[in-house]
Amino acid sequence: NVIVKNRSQVFGYYDHNMMVMFERTGDHLKEKPKYTPRQRLWYIRAKEVLLSTGSIERPIVFGNNDTPGVFLSAAAKEYIKVYGVLVGKKPLIFTNNDSAYETALEFKKQGVEPIILDTREEQSSELIDAAKNQNIQIKFSHAVVAANGYKKVKSAQIAHISSDKRNLGKIEKINCDCICVSGFWTPTIHLSSQSGNKTKFDEKIDAFVPGKSKQNETTVGSASGIFNLEETISTSFEKGYQLSKKITNNDNKVSVPQVSEKKFTNHDKFWCVPLPDKKNFKRFLDFQNDVTVSDIELALREGYRSIEHVKRYTTLGMATDQGKTSNLNGLQLVSDVENKVVPSVGHTTFRPPYTPVSIGAIVGREIGKHSKPTRKSPMHSWHEKNNAVFV
């Protein structure tokens, strides 16, 4: 009694637990039957909704970070594990947390020697120790100052960074052909927020998480700010069981699978590398709309204080990705300049669609009960009689 929809994306969460989803039905087929649509739109009204939307890795901001060859660390790992593709043969891993060490270990498995720059002071964890045991070079308290290269990354300028993250040491050059960046993880709360859920800021993970639900909606996993696999599975199974029991009166519990994972240590609350003296590198926050750190600083100097005003002045988060990797870094910048905490700065509004959807899928041809009568002007019949051209 379970329907699984592959190649599908819920892009809007509306009142009365109505969700709108588009299904990609034809684009992936080499030979598709006649009249097969490219996409199909679904209107779903649910008694209960369980959101397991995950989280998105966020970058660390540094100079020339829009140079081709700069990747999110998780993306580089996925290229290796899912597609068998190496994004580079001289990778530089730049991180403030343990998850990027998994990427470094994947490179090592493929016979590639990565170098890790960790903004944290030297410490130990299961993943850090695993990297050391593989003889992976690790530079603690170091940061990428800027990427070098015109059409692709050819090297990087790196430096020791002070414990307060405000001062850089002597800059040195290190050869690399890609830079894999990890600035920790941001819960994907867009659908939860669209449902009317009031978000709250979690100081532990430096990100917003769902607060009290307004509709019959429950968020689980990393979308709720839980990044431990064992806890994610146990809480998700429990909440799923409670919802199933509520809807079906079925009291059959499902055994929770046992998992083993390497434990992560705390991440570094660091998101942007300071500019060195007499340097003016472009440091991009929003890659789609080319919004830089200096753009945000200018908006604040011009007197814009509300984050919604800063957003509109700079177009931060207004591209088709709606700031999925940039919004939180933008909020951190505003809070730093204004000497405020992030919750007092607020956050921008999440609006549907979560991902772009074609107008053709929304308009449709076979719309059934969602048909709406065509409204015509009082002059319509006269226009028809006089052979008007309708556009």
Positions of predicted regions on the chain:
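N- or domain-start disorder-to-order transition segments that initiate the globular core
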Residues: 371-391
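Residues forming the flavin
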Residues: 1-374, 378
